[in-house]
């Protein structure tokens, strides 16, 4: 009777080939993602006579030294000597927008996730509506917000149409991050707090929120990175305000220098 006997282990040679077959596609994907980033990092050490060419014609740290020269890094000038691109202001705008967006998205996502836990009628449809911001094209969202703002007489800007578009984009991701931890949350801890006389509000701030701290931090960081690097949701909605991605794209269209890398 061999039904209870263990199966023989596969040959060592077969194990090695299976590891190679599984590992090769993973290595190709990682190379596809990270090799262009490595090339850009190497090009940043291009010499003064080199441009966006590989391999390097010369090497040096000239373009890193130019980061301390505000006339070089913060202003590209046209033939009249007028400032065209202000990188310093663009960086500040991106930091302000990303920080504000991350906080607002996390607060809204936390409230939405808390509501989803009650399993009310229509909760599944509401979840799909919340996640629409992920699958909707950024240009469509931007154009819709700008059109609505124009009808309402709201001026397009960083903290008007800009913040709305970025919250619409980042909030679904924050919602998913928070819901992952909520699905593993032990409700008995909250029920114990209610039994001891804590109100729902007090139980949330003293029990639920501390236990959700990893999800809150992850949501803040995720939303910040998405907002800071976002271009499609910013192209039509910033008005005269410029974020770093918008300024970088405009600068690259005019001239590519290793300082941009």
Language-model-derived ranges and their functions:
Residues 1, 9-15, 96-130, 143, ...:
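Transmembrane-helix boundary motif in ABC transporter permease subunits
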